[in-house]
């Protein structure tokens, strides 16, 4: 049995078998009401910045006791409110991404406004005039789709291409929020913890080598 730390804004706890699949862990959290029933299609587990396969197990990825595993929504998922289950043993912190509503509004406006003129027998016998052709082209012209906006909840600025993509939470951010500290990335806590652990091991090793050399 292993105890995993899943990083976001709230915490839960659950003991899982290291040979159980990650998909079964999703089902277990769904049964407790922490995640929705369709959580597998909306969220994914991440370990060291790599998205985990739902059919693999913790042992396959080398996830040991007290490892830091992240849960983050997929780019197409919506905001989800988690309930509080203090009896479980699985630390879960969740910071949902803000969905982009601009593109959906543009598509709905296009469906309501754009119409295709019908073809009658008179149109087949009498070719349309130049003025009619230009008006038909105007009706068939689709409105320009809006560019993607920053995933930060309080920002509506345009995202940076490539440089604004976060590899840890799959978010797309503007110049002001592209750094992990600026958009409160879900992986920031675990990365700092791993760096602290590496520094601790390095200092302990250097201290031990110093004592051996003095002896």
Swiss-Prot record:
Listed binding positions for Zn(2+) 2 are 166, 169, 183, 185
Task: From the UniProt entry, list the residue stretches annotated as the region Disordered.
Answer: 116-138
Transmembrane is among the record's keywords: no
Recorded GO cellular component terms are: cytoplasm; cytosol; nucleus
Q: Which Pfam families match?
A: zf-AN1
Q: Name one GO molecular function term.
A: zinc ion binding
The portions of this protein that span the membrane are none
List the biased-composition ranges (Polar residues). Answer: 116-128
Q: Which InterPro entries match?
A: AN1-like_Znf (IPR035896), Ubiquitin-like_domsf (IPR029071), Znf_AN1 (IPR000058)
Task: Give its localization.
Answer: Cytoplasm; Nucleus
- GO biological process: any one? SRP-dependent cotranslational protein targeting to membrane, translocation
Q: Write out the residues that bind Zn(2+) 1.
A: 150, 155, 174, 177
Q: Can you say what this protein is called?
A: AN1-type zinc finger protein C1271.05c
Q: Which organism is it from?
A: Schizosaccharomyces pombe (strain 972 / ATCC 24843)
């Amino acid at each position: 049995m292993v105890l995993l730390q899943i990083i976001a804004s709230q915490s839960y706890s659950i003991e899982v078998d290291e040979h159980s699949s990650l998909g079964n862990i999703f089902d277990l959290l769904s049964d407790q009401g922490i995640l929705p029933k369709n959580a597998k299609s909306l969220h994914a587990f991440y370990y060291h910045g790599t998205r985990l396969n739902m059919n693999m197990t913790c042992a396959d990825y080398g996830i040991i006791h007290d490892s830091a595993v992240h849960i983050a929504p997929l780019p197409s998922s919506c905001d989800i409110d988690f309930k509080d289950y203090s009896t479980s043993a699985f630390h879960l912190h969740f910071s949902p991404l803000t969905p982009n509503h601009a593109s959906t509004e543009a598509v709905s406006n296009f469906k309501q406004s754009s119409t295709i003129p019908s073809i009658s027998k008179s149109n087949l016998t009498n070719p349309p005039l130049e003025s009619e052709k230009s008006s038909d082209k105007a009706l068939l012209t689709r409105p320009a789709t809006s560019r993607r906006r920053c995933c930060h909840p309080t920002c509506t600025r345009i995202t940076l291409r490539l440089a604004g993509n976060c590899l840890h939470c799959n978010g797309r951010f503007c110049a002001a929020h592209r750094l992990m500290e600026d958009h409160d990335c879900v992986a920031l806590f675990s990365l700092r913890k791993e760096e602290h652990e590496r520094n601790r091991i390095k200092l302990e090793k250097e201290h031990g080598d110093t004592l051996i050399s003095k002896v």
